[in-house]
Design a protein with these regions (language model features):
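Alpha-helical segment proximal to the catalytic Tyr-Lys
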Residues: 128, 172-176
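Active-site loop immediately N-terminal to the catalytic Tyr-X3-Lys motif
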Residues: 101, 148-155
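Canonical Rossmann dinucleotide-binding motif of NAD(H)/NADP(H)-dependent dehydrogenases/reductases
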Residues: 3-34
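Active-site helix of classical SDR
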Residues: 123, 159, 167
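Substrate-binding pocket helix/loop in short-chain dehydrogenase/reductase
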Residues: 99-100, 107-112, 138, 212
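Conserved glycine-rich Rossmann-like NAD(P)H-binding loop of the short-chain dehydrogenase/reductase
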Residues: 29-46
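Residue(s) in the substrate-gating loop at a strand-loop-helix junction
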Residues: 143
Length: 213
């Protein structure tokens, strides 16, 4: 039996990239998944894209991860449909690159709202439900850019570094409370996902790969 068989997961940014890959993997091992994403059109294609799985094994939720009320609704929908919450993968994110002088304050706030505030909200509202389920695992997708800075990624660097330390704080909180809930951040290097599309569009795919390397 898989470690995740019968478990229930919420995945943000699940319509594409790492979020979608995680959803497929968890479902292949018997988990039930709530697929959250802001892109309704792509979510609507999930029954076809996931046709090899039992259609009762997943559900979708159109979700602005920066909206607190939407998080409350997502948590309630997941518990109502699947009965519990065991896993949260905070995968939603954006990358709007610019140096510290060129970055507009509205852009700075937007990047932090999507990349960092959403992780705070997800953890805040998932932990009480996970503690009721007996155990849980939270995986927050940070980035190598949360460890190694770039001169032209000020907002992205700081938002992803924030995810790293927030995850540590959440893990310590759960340990202090005696909850059997793990919280970890992961820090991928460059992965060919839609978050890199602006870079590829700006420089062309080959030059973008060369710059990122």
């Amino acid at each position: 039996m898989s470690r995740v068989e019968g478990k229930v997961a919420i995945i943000t940014g699940a319509a594409s990239g790492l979020g979608y890959a995680a959803a497929e993997k968890l479902m292949s091992e018997g988990a039930k998944v709530m697929l959250s994403d802001i892109n309704k059109d792509v979510l609507d294609t999930m029954p076809e894209r996931l046709k090899d799985f039992n259609q009762t094994q997943f559900s979708t939720f159109v979700h602005d991860v920066t909206n607190e009320e939407a998080w409350i609704e997502l948590i309630e929908k997941t518990e109502n449909e699947f009965g519990k919450i065991n896993i949260l993968i905070n995968s939603a994110g954006i990358s709007l690159g610019a140096d510290i002088v060129s970055t507009e304050f509205d852009v700075w706030k937007k990047v932090h709202q999507v990349n960092l505030d959403s992780v705070f909200l997800g953890c805040k509202y998932a932990i009480p439900k996970m503690s009721k389920s007996g155990q849980g695992s939270i995986i927050n997708i940070s980035s190598i850019s949360g460890i190694v800075a770039g001169w032209n990624t000020a907002a992205y660097n700081s938002s992803k570094a924030g995810v790293r330390l927030l995850s540590k704080s959440v893990a310590l909180y759960c340990a202090k409370k005696g909850y059997d809930i793990r919280c970890n951040s992961v820090h991928p290097a460059f992965v060919n996902t839609p978050i890199l599309d602006p870079i590829k569009q700006a420089f062309g795919a080959e030059e973008a790969v060369a710059k990122l390397a």
